[in-house]
Amino acid sequence: MKYFTHILLFLVLLLTGCGDKEKLSGKVVFSDGQPLTTGTIYFTNNNYTARAHLRENGTYDVGSLSERDGLPAGTYKVYISGAIENNADPTDETMRLLIAPEFASESKTPLTITVPGERVYNITVERPQPVKKPPR
């Protein structure tokens, strides 16, 4: 009986932490309207982190433990990881960031969202500034 009580108490505590979650989806595009076709978008605050993989058309559905399971109420920083492109030369291992660096940094991102709120959160990001090569 004691074992059953412990299991029941554990389940109650576990389910208490599972509040209502809001379904959230959207699209990530550049300022020219072209979709960002690769990367993972993160929604994070002090208590919770959720992610979604971008599809080739730039759309996403938010999940924490699995895709599309939503976000609990709160304000979140939004940033994108893995938005990189391999160099066309297969012998060159360098990669190029497809978005401006501030959108790829949890500490520098200008993007935030408050949940509950809009259930569709479309995001516009900027491309990185071209790197100026020093004169020869």
Predicted regions and their residues:
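Beta-strand-dominated extracellular/periplasmic modules and repeats
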Residues: 18-136
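Sec-dependent bacterial lipoprotein signal peptides
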Residues: 1-16
